[in-house]
A protein has these predicted regions:
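C-terminal active-site subregion of NodB/CE4 polysaccharide deacetylases
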Residues: 1-47, 52-56, 112-139, 145-217
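Histidine-centered catalytic micro-motifs
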Residues: 5, 9-10, 99-107
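Acidic (Asp/Glu)-rich catalytic clusters
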Residues: 36-39, 60-68, 85-101, 156
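A short alpha/beta connector and helix-capping loop motif
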Residues: 54-77
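Short beta-strand and adjacent tight-turn residues that come in two discontinuous sequence segments
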Residues: 73, 103, 163-165
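Short, small-residue-enriched loops and turns at beta-alpha junctions
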Residues: 78-81, 108-112
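Charged helix-capping and loop-helix junction motifs
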Residues: 83-91, 115-122
Length: 217
């Protein structure tokens, strides 16, 4: 089993795009200490959602210093936003060996989308990110972590190689469905160490059950 950890922003959230976004940003000093711990755990996989510019400015050099890699799930609708990853930033990440994934176009929930909106979020966004990053975009991360059976079928029809959620339980390496633990402003190196060192328990079982129910509803 592996543990997927998801970051959203490093440093200070200057402007919240959604209520509560700042809670998912981590102080840079804490981030560096977390990476020091993560580097000791080869079973950990890292990813970054939302495509904030801190991915390239702060996260990339810290990852490189520790020989770590991560997948960066960017937003196609923010490629011209100075606070977000632009095409040059995506190409920089890719040239450093970091895979680029899709987080959609507008950071909206993907459940219950019309066919028109789904085409933009699942197909057009992927194409735009592939062009912007000059390479393939094979994986997707669900905005806000919401999904149901219909969305799972849509994503499979789009032939994504893997889909990442915000469900909190360990995942199987190579599985199409990848659950993740989101890192928040409350986390520290010590909390990350505790997460990675403990055995799967009741919380993980609850997460697995909730995920199974969402996939059949």
């Amino acid at each position: 089993m592996i543990t997927n950890l998801c970051f959203h922003g490093v440093g200070v959230c200057a402007r919240e795009r959604e209520d509560g976004e700042a809670h998912y940003w981590v102080r840079e000093s804490h981030f560096l200490r977390m990476l020091d711990e993560i580097a000791l755990h080869p079973e950990v996989r890292l990813s970054f959602d939302d495509g904030n510019i801190s991915d390239a400015a702060a996260a990339l050099p810290a990852l490189q210093d520790r020989g770590l890699t991560a997948t960066f799930f960017a937003l196609a609708g923010r490629l011209d936003d100075p606070a977000s990853l632009r095409p040059a930033d995506l190409r920089l990440l890719r040239s450093a060996g970091m895979p680029i994934g899709s987080h959609g176009w507008s950071h909206i929930p993907w459940r219950g989308m019309s066919d028109e909106v789904a085409a933009r979020e699942l197909v057009e966004a992927r194409s735009a990110l592939s062009e912007a990053s000059a390479g393939p975009v094979d994986e997707a991360a669900l905005p806000l972590g919401r999904y149901d059976r219909a969305l799972v079928h849509r994503l499979k029809r789009c032939d994504y190689a893997a889909v990442y959620t915000s469900d909190r339980f360990p995942a199987r390496a190579g599985s199409w469905f990848q659950a993740r633990y989101s890192v928040t402003a409350d986390d520290t190196r010590e909390s990350i160490r505790a997460r990675l060192s403990r055995r799967p328990g009741l919380e993980d079982a609850r997460g697995l059950l909730k995920s199974a129910l969402k996939r059949v509803r």
